[in-house]
Amino acid sequence: MANEFRVCDDCKAPNLKTLIPRLKKLDPNATIKIGCQSYCGPGRKKTFAFVNNRPVSALTEDELIEKIAERLKKS
């Protein structure tokens, strides 16, 4: 089953210009959906992405990528 990443283009925390290429590097075959994820409260304070319908957040993009990589290893 292919992985799915969902990221928000409304929230201020995620920088899509840098985050999306890094997500593609983690899994080139994953589907990436961009749009509101209704995760506004945490999304204003932390960078986040949904990985296979589960939220993953961190204070920095580097930490987020590490957490996502760990999540993908567990799947």
Curated annotation (Swiss-Prot):
InterPro entries: DUF1450, UPF0741. It holds the Pfam family DUF1450. Coiled coil: none annotated. It comes from the Bacteria. HAMAP family: UPF0741. Belongs to the UPF0741 family. This is UPF0741 protein GWCH70_3359.
